[in-house]
């Protein structure tokens, strides 16, 4: 396992100021949450220290009602923290597959072997895969996306999450 940011995020978030949070417990998460407009929990390995840092900052952001968007690993982390259910999924490792977004078929990528089976009680499902697993969800200022938009030739996120993540003048 390694700890690094996917290079696709640089181009995907072009024009936005990026601040990378080190996996260090000796930092002021409350101050970080005060200074950040949003927190994106990117994909990657589920390393204990990383998970602890992300959980502390996500909690501080939630206290301030600021956007927290989880991508892949981040979506699973938020789902778990909020009481959703994660299950093993076959046939999703390193391939494209369809998701349903309010009756519209979208093609997304997949790099995992787990999925979201049930969402916490206040979340709204935005996209599901062909087996009914939840691929994206939103709950106020919190959102999860199982695929990697930063690894797509034409990145796509549901409109609700695009608005949450990229809205101006927060």
Placement of each model-derived feature along the sequence:
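N-terminal beta1-alpha1 cap of cysteine-dependent amidohydrolase-like domains
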Residues: 1-73, 81, 87, 92-94, ...
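An acidic, glycine-rich "communication" segment
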Residues: 88-110
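Active-site-proximal beta-strand elements of phosphoester/diester hydrolases
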Residues: 107-108, 143-148
């Amino acid at each position: 396992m390694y700890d690094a940011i996917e290079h696709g995020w640089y181009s995907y978030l072009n024009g936005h100021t990026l601040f990378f949070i080190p996996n260090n417990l000796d930092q002021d998460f409350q101050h970080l949450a005060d200074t950040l407009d949003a927190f994106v929990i990117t994909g990657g390995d589920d390393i204990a220290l990383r998970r602890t840092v992300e959980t502390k900052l996500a909690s501080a952001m939630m206290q301030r009602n600021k956007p927290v968007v989880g991508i892949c690993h981040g979506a699973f982390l938020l789902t778990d923290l909020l009481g959703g259910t994660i299950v093993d999924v076959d046939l999703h490792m390193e391939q494209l597959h369809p998701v349903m977004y309010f009756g519209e078929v979208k093609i997304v990528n997949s790099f995992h072997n787990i999925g979201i089976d049930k969402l916490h009680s206040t979340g709204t499902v935005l996209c599901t895969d062909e087996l009914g697993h939840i691929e994206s969800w939103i709950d106020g200022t919190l959102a999860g996306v199982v695929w990697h938009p930063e690894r797509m030739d034409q990145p796509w996120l549901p409109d609700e999450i695009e608005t949450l993540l990229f809205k101006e003048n927060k």
